[in-house]
Amino acid sequence: MKTKTLFIFSAILTLSIFAPNETFAQTAGNLIEPKIINAETAQFSTKKLRKVDQMIERDIAAGFPGAVLVVVKDGRIIKKAAYGYSKKYEGSELLRRPAKMKTRTMFDLASNTKMYATNFALQRLVSQGKLDVYEKVSAYLPGFKDQPGDLIKGKDKIRVIDVLQHQSGLPSSFYFYTPEKAGKYYSQERDKTIEYLTKIPLDYQTGTKHVYSDIGYMLLGCIVEKLTGKPLDVYTEQELYKPLRLKHTLYNPLQKGFKPKQFAATERMGNTRDGVIQFPNIRTNTLQGEVHDEKAFYSMDGVSGHAGLFSNADDMAILLQVMLNKGSYRNISLFDQKTADLFTAPSATDPTFALGWRRNGSKSMEWMFGPHASENAYGHTGWTGTVTIIDPAYNLGIALLTNKKHTPVIDPEENPNVFEGDQFPTGSYGSVITAIYEAME
């Protein structure tokens, strides 16, 4: 398999971070002019980086669909590569001529939306003094309160920080889009879903454990909309991505001039898990350029705090650099260093959780970070096959974007959520991340 690999790229500016925002604008330099560099310039072994290629290429040869990898070190993209195919299937049938993956291919980020849309927005609002993470959720969403018949009470005590740390008591998910499962909260209308979100009952007492929650991040997206008076997609695109000059990071891209062929395909047969799932209005075509997540697509019109964002390697490199710069890029300050530190600090009860971000807080996170990341590394994953790693100790950022769900479901009747692509090392992330760290000298 021929791999499109570039070890030399346009430089990304590594900026010093100044705590006062007004000082930053006066002292920051312009973007460094593009330079031709090799991996050794950034203290990487070209030979060992080739092992990363070989690892992914082996998976491609064995049936893994495709991937794009970008690595940022010391303010420069030192590796960007495309592997395999952006689309191999049309429905259940293999294409005679699968579409090759390109480094500019755009991906459904799935739950990385939580970080690079919702968290970025929240971090900006906190930095501007418009949001207090220690304030009650109900202060921003008055409808967020206990309902008659709720077995577990206490929504009036839940703070924004509890939701960010995934210890609010909210359930992991909810099937709004399926009438049999949602009952009175069935909704395939965005406004109605937002109303119902505040009424979903708690699953456990706040603060007693960490349960990763899409519902929590859907609510956080609603808080952004309430505070800004703008839909989440409009706010993030105007206030975050436009100042950064990002052209390929957005919600609902097919409604904004992009074509399906520009995207990595996800599930082969819509949301049917190879034909075993049914609900009203379910998609059955191969998904390409539409958000895969059911709650986001059917119940939130493609725009939600937990899923829906698309991006590509070049844009992700800049977003990684913003975090490495603790909020700034070029002469733009999205949020200040104090806010960046607040959001990436470990939870007192579980060091693998920060405010939204996942941290390399214990060996339990080795599947994502590998064994060599620093204890202060943080990042996130997305169900469709995306992982991002930010390691301040090494001034290192990694985005591995895959379309691992663009493969058959292994056993639809037994478990409709396990795809062939999940079983490959590339789709499990940790081995690729480990090889990248081992290439550093």
From Swiss-Prot:
Q: What is its EC number?
A: 3.5.1.28
Q: Which residues form a coiled coil?
A: none
GO function terms (MF aspect): N-acetylmuramoyl-L-alanine amidase activity
Q: Which UniProt keywords apply?
A: Cell wall biogenesis/degradation, Hydrolase, Signal
User: Where is the secretion signal located?
Assistant: 1-25
Q: In which pathway does it act?
A: Cell wall biogenesis; peptidoglycan recycling
Q: Reply yes or no: does the keyword Hydrolase apply.
A: yes
What's this protein's name? N-acetylmuramyl-L-alanine amidase
Similarity comment: Belongs to the peptidase S12 family.
